[in-house]
């Protein structure tokens, strides 16, 4: 009060008022502050007083020829006075308005091309749908997200080379454009930007946006793909969220999504093959996603997902050092442990050998729908703080943490035997056995865990064994928090090794990933995934396997033909026949195989000639391990379209139909390719394939006319006789059988009788 009174007294004196309002500020420090350096110290004030002047802008003298002195309203646009200290003219803000309305226009053709990312963003927002705003507590966790929709996935260095080549093609400096994507983009952009008048630097900035993935570590609740991140400020606040559906998709999100689906399919398929690692690599190298080789995408794309990381590890690429268990990403934040094998007894008195982590450790656990902080000692959970979207997600996190803790009460909670197997029918390791068991039913686990009274801590509540929240009691060591746990922010990548069963280890030997961790979620890929590997034929069902198998035989017929006659065993063991076996009824596989192999052997025996179409048709059946039996078949069954369909050993069927006239094969009505038969095959002597169904009567008999060729022979009526030229230029007399006999006896007797007839 005293001070205010004093001030009032001072202000009542006219001298005080005069000093404060009239005198100039000549304090050196203040003058220095506002005049040193080029940087404007008070831009807002500067702008205000500049705009209050009549001519606040300076322009090149040429402007006087380009702009009239006065506008339509008669207002002056520029002053004849020169700008002090330069030879520029003083110009009014009205001149800018005049220029914008009446000034020269330039072609706008390049704007949508250069500012592509912005134009596309506007379109997405125009077609997007904003829903209602909900007020609720937002559990946000920081995740590394892509903030730049619509980009290619070039590394900074690759992009730099492309930009230099497109924008400054004449600059010196070595630029090596090696990758397919670099070359395609460069060509495309050079064409698009011919005669572009936009400042090169601007073009370069915009190209960078299009070529490089930019990521930020941002707090997110909800969608993490780039088309959601670009509207993050509109869709979630501290206590509210607004529903939003993007008005378009962008290729980079589609690539990420399709890559995950392809990787999961490949890992799942590799797991069940004889050599998982070799199969996985073969599939990664022969798969394309949206027309780009999967291995190229893996090298450039930073997506971290279990299956994707297994594929990267197999290719020798570095991956994140965090490990995966139960679908959660674990990152150790402090402590250390040594690992020791220990035998434990389950509640069912089954012995399990587990690798115990001895020592105190702290981890963050991050999943899709829940996150947690875990503190544990040797086989003991000390504390678990969980936050999640809903009860179910929180329960999932608790189960994973309880199993990971390796506590005795968890192992004793097992009821019944643990015998979970993976896709290849191999038993899972003990930790995954326990995990699967409790994921199926965790009632006993929660019941036996124990509960404790809790202190009232801000933002934390308890959770009971039936997964209901509670403020008084909670499962021992476990609390629910409103706050999420941030994802591990570092982008550090480490060198890893992978064994043939696709287990990925860091350099200390800790398992980071294994196929058990790959999600079973099925999705539909946004981009076309083309699996060229035969191992992936079955992904589109049995029909695809059938068609692909026959297409493969026809495409590679030249090679197969030679192998068929010279080293059949190698041919039968080809992996391309593996998928086909799943179509053949289990009980019949061995018998069919034995039958077809014997048949083929007889074809080889009879003067080394054969029937192309029949070999192609029956070849896939010979791949199974054969059973020795005298069984004869006139048709072989394959399981497609939900039932058994028959392939006739002789002749066409809906499954396998060869059109002699067009030489085209259709499998289940789908074209499987055309056969270029050997030119001499039609006119050659009889081959064993045709002798089936004919009885050899003896040496040539002139009464039955000149010797027929193979094609003419097929026109005989049942019971009719004819002379036939066989392979080595010999002629024998045959009769077409009156009934369809067993094929094998024909071939066997034919072989013997030809020898007799000739000798």
Swiss-Prot record:
It holds the Pfam family Flu_PB2_2nd. A motif (Nuclear localization signal) lies at residues 736-739. One of its GO terms (biological process) is 7-methylguanosine mRNA capping. The keyword RNA-binding does not apply. The record marks 627 as: Avian adaptation. Plays an essential role in transcription initiation and cap-stealing mechanism, in which cellular capped pre-mRNAs are used to generate primers for viral transcription. Recognizes and binds the 7-methylguanosine-containing cap of the target pre-RNA which is subsequently cleaved after 10-13 nucleotides by the viral protein PA. Plays a role in the initiation of the viral genome replication and modulates the activity of the ribonucleoprotein (RNP) complex. Belongs to the influenza viruses PB2 family. Keywords: Cap snatching, Eukaryotic host gene expression shutoff by virus, Eukaryotic host transcription shutoff by virus, Host gene expression shutoff by virus, Host nucleus, Host-virus interaction, Inhibition of host RNA polymerase II by virus, mRNA capping, mRNA processing, Viral transcription, Virion. It is found in: Virion; Host nucleus. The keyword Coiled coil does not apply. InterPro entries: Flu_PB2_2nd, Flu_PB2_6th, Flu_PB2_C, Flu_PB2_CAP-bd, Flu_PB2_middle, Flu_PB2_N, INV_PB2, PB2_helical. The lineage of its organism: Viruses, Riboviria, Orthornavirae, Negarnaviricota, Polyploviricotina. Gene3D superfamilies: Polymerase Basic Protein 2, C-terminal domain. GO terms for molecular function: RNA binding; RNA-directed RNA polymerase activity. HAMAP family: INV_PB2. Influenza RNA polymerase is composed of three subunits: PB1, PB2 and PA. Interacts (via N-terminus) with PB1 (via C-terminus). Interacts with nucleoprotein NP (via N-terminus). This is Polymerase basic protein 2. GO terms for cellular component: host cell nucleus; virion component. SUPFAM superfamilies: PB2 C-terminal domain-like.
